[in-house]
Amino acid sequence: MFGRLHRIMLVAGFGCSTLLPLSIQAATPAEQAVLVPVNALFDGMAKRDSEAMKKVMLPGGTMVLMRDGKPVQLTLEGFADRVGKPGTTSIEERIHDPLVRIDHDLAVVWAPFEFLTDGKVDHCGTDLFNLVWTDGKWLIASVADTGRKDCPVK
């Protein structure tokens, strides 16, 4: 299953990793390949590009956002449509020190994050991404986060 195409993806992921800030680079080429769709999601969010976000999502994927101790559930497609609406507020999500684990065609990314609006931290917490290897690429199957307002000042 992880033949020539997988090796190409790993090399491509490694090559793309040189464009990533050091704080979100993973240790191995395989881990870097897992982070490619995560970073593409963040890029699509910043550009408010719902189609770019959907390209790295498994159809039917889900999201759970913990807000004020309560889970808010939505589909990944619904999230992309919501974030992809035009707006004047700039948004950016940053992760750091990602913990990446891979078992064959499943992967998980656990990382602290900050979400910025107009360059200021709006909320922070931990992101959890579940990814699947399908059709020769990693896709985000689900996302959960612990968004909270009590973020450390940086």
Residue ranges, per PLM feature:
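Extracytoplasmic
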Residues: 48, 58, 95, 104-106, ...
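Short beta-strand edge/turn micro-motifs at domain boundaries
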Residues: 124-150
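A mature extracytoplasmic/lumenal domain signature
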Residues: 57, 67, 111-115, 127, ...
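Sec-dependent signal peptide recognition
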Residues: 4-11, 131
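Bacterial N-terminal signal peptides
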Residues: 8-21
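Short, low-complexity N-terminal intrinsically disordered segments enriched in polar/charged residues
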Residues: 2, 20-55, 59, 154
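Surface-exposed, charged secondary-structure patches
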Residues: 62, 76-121
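N-terminal, post-signal-peptide region of Sec/Tat-exported proteins
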Residues: 46-86
